[in-house]
Amino acid sequence: MATAAYEQLKLHITPEKFYVEACDDGADDVLTIDRVSTEVTLAVKKDVPPSAVTRPIFGILGTIHLVAGNYLIVITKKIKVGEFFSHVVWKATDFDVLSYKKTMLHLTDIQLQDNKTFLAMLNHVLNVDGFYFSTTYDLTHTLQRLSNTSPEFQEMSLLERADQRFVWNGHLLRELSAQPEVHRFALPVLHGFITMHSCSINGKYFDWILISRRSCFRAGVRYYVRGIDSEGHAANFVETEQIVHYNGSKASFVQTRGSIPVFWSQRPNLKYKPLPQISKVANHMDGFQRHFDSQVIIYGKQVIINLINQKGSEKPLEQTFATMVSSLGSGMMRYIAFDFHKECKNMRWDRLSILLDQVAEMQDELSYFLVDSAGQVVANQEGVFRSNCMDCLDRTNVIQSLLARRSLQAQLQRLGVLHVGQKLEEQDEFEKIYKNAWADNANACAKQYAGTGALKTDFTRTGKRTHLGLIMDGWNSMIRYYKNNFSDGFRQDSIDLFLGNYSVDELESHSPLSVPRDWKFLALPIIMVVAFSMCIICLLMAGDTWTETLAYVLFWGVASIGTFFIILYNGKDFVDAPRLVQKEKID
């Protein structure tokens, strides 16, 4: 049993110090943070001055250094998600960012503006839905990983034992991490999605849980973070675990998703779908092998399901992925290419059964994790399906939900919830819960990476592709286009700041946020708008003859269209690009 973190806290604020008081039964600890020296110490309740301003909080997210100095980030609101084997799981829904400094008079105007921008970045990340924590249970590990731990591991604090891939406030907690005596004040926070449901089939009640854990390594937004880095971390890597708890028995099925693990990019350039660029100079095999070496160590066998198009702009990526798997020649890897869009065109989504039939035997070999009511491990999951499309969102989520249902069918039959021959699809009440949960999971993962809800969720929710779903996909695609081109640079900077990929240095002579714009950035859009406006005016206010009107319309029309294509040609100069961290530029 891990050493629990404190659940009930009070924050006492004085001009000199922050005091975080533990209010759990029998607790006398007070975490003290000096607002001048930034020193963190442990005190007792009698050390809190009665003059302090007091407020309840629900956890410490951590501290961060900005231009104005240090800031303390605390959780101010939470909602209960459910109970996980008698452990309460919470979603953090509101935060407060508190400055150590009492005044900003020591800052110049430029520093004040930069500090304001950095605070806006912090708040942007905090406002993204999907931060979860528990004060008594380790949410960062799967059931199978937790079952294979030593007694020493189980005695560690939640912070010490957490899987660092999924601790999104790891950088913010670095000061508390260095002092084991204050670990009970430190909450490892997960980013992703968690839902819990009490369900009933055949009069038998069981808990069904879905957890998606987003990796904080190579984290970012859709078009600015693709492929892998030099350490083998894949973009948009998510570990998804489905858990069943029935009569003391526990079963789980784990899947992963992650960007195609080679060095490639797809930077926005105002085009609806920028061309993917595969690096011609990077050592793809080195990064590829690093990625899968770590995946095999953590999860075992890898069944790779590549769902991207096998023609057009996506074809080179599919060929590269297949070549890499073949060249590595590992017996721990199986590669399956399934052209999702080709197979399911004309809304023939029933054809997904082709893929499910193809991998059925492999899924049976991989199995799932099962512990009986006596605590004995009955079955281990021997590997995972690693699914991907271009974004690892829409197509990926559809396939994962179908694979998870097949595993759940086997688990519930083995546990005696389903009768022999009974199909999960026939259990209408549970099916509704199941489909909606997986659609909600898709939306959460999509919003965190692409900025909008997922596409194709009408199929996940209903089992059918609908015309309304197509319209909603079109709307979400338009929103994605706007965000990817005109706001994702800020979103990427926000994530890099939050995760510590960029550290603020107030002594920097040049502000990283100040990026001079080329003359084209202002001049060309103005010319295009003026030319288009003149074209409309000429149409509305006809000249003396139709030839004169036509000449004016043609002139201004050609000017506006020509300017538009010049802007499109120079698209990368017009998009909102990250400013804090330069990712590998390989295009």
From Swiss-Prot:
PROSITE patterns the record matches: SAC
Residue span of region Essential for phosphatidylinositol-4-phosphate phosphatase activity: 452-587
Residues carrying N6-acetyllysine: 456
GO terms for MF: phosphatase activity; phosphatidylinositol phosphate 4-phosphatase activity; phosphatidylinositol-3-phosphate phosphatase activity; phosphatidylinositol-4-phosphate phosphatase activity
Expressed in which tissues: Detected in heart, brain, lung, liver, kidney, pancreas and testis.
Class of this enzyme: hydrolase
Subcellular location, principal: endoplasmic reticulum
Keyword Acetylation belongs to the record: yes
Reaction equation(s) it catalyzes: a 1,2-diacyl-sn-glycero-3-phospho-(1D-myo-inositol-3-phosphate) + H2O = a 1,2-diacyl-sn-glycero-3-phospho-(1D-myo-inositol) + phosphate; a 1,2-diacyl-sn-glycero-3-phospho-(1D-myo-inositol 4-phosphate) + H2O = a 1,2-diacyl-sn-glycero-3-phospho-(1D-myo-inositol) + phosphate
Topological domains, Lumenal: 542-548
Ribosomal protein as UniProt keyword: no
Domain SAC residues, every copy: 122-451
InterPro entries, per database record: SAC_dom
Compartments where located: Endoplasmic reticulum membrane; Golgi apparatus membrane
Any one GO BP annotation for this protein: phosphatidylinositol dephosphorylation
Transmembrane segments: 521-541, 549-569
Cellular component, GO, one term: endoplasmic reticulum
A Pfam family it matches: Syja_N
Activity regulation details: Inhibited by bis-peroxovanadates and hydrogen peroxide.
Membrane topology note: Multi-pass membrane protein
Protein name, as recorded: Phosphatidylinositol-3-phosphatase SAC1
Native organism: Homo sapiens (Human)
Recorded name of the encoding gene: SACM1L
